[in-house]
Amino acid sequence: AGFRDSFTLFGKKPIEKLIYLNCNIKETVYNAAEKVINSNAECIVCMDDKICCQVLEKFQAIQVSVPKDIKLVSFYDSYFLEHCKPAVTSLRFDEANLGIIACEELIGRIEQRTYSSRVYTGYKVMLRASTR
């Protein structure tokens, strides 16, 4: 996953036992959130807004305070994260443009044209209360 590349770029090593991927149902998200909070992690990074909202829900149920006890961020910004209590720091990007670029790359590969192995799109960090 790309987030692992960022660790390498900054000379860091992720704590693998604290990485929970494929949390597709609320119960697995809740279990992962509880394990992370019990490990004394500083921050949770969620892959999307739905998972992030579920983490917040779990924390409220077990009286964990964001950002006092743990910080919370998401790779995907949405209206919901902007209006959560607390509002969640996230990445905002142009979804339509990303879709266009992805389709162009796929068509290029299908037609066996030259394509990029990596495509960079713009994004903006929406710094909010969950990390302050």
Model-inferred region functions:
Residues A1-R132:
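Bacterial carbohydrate/catabolite-sensing allosteric modules
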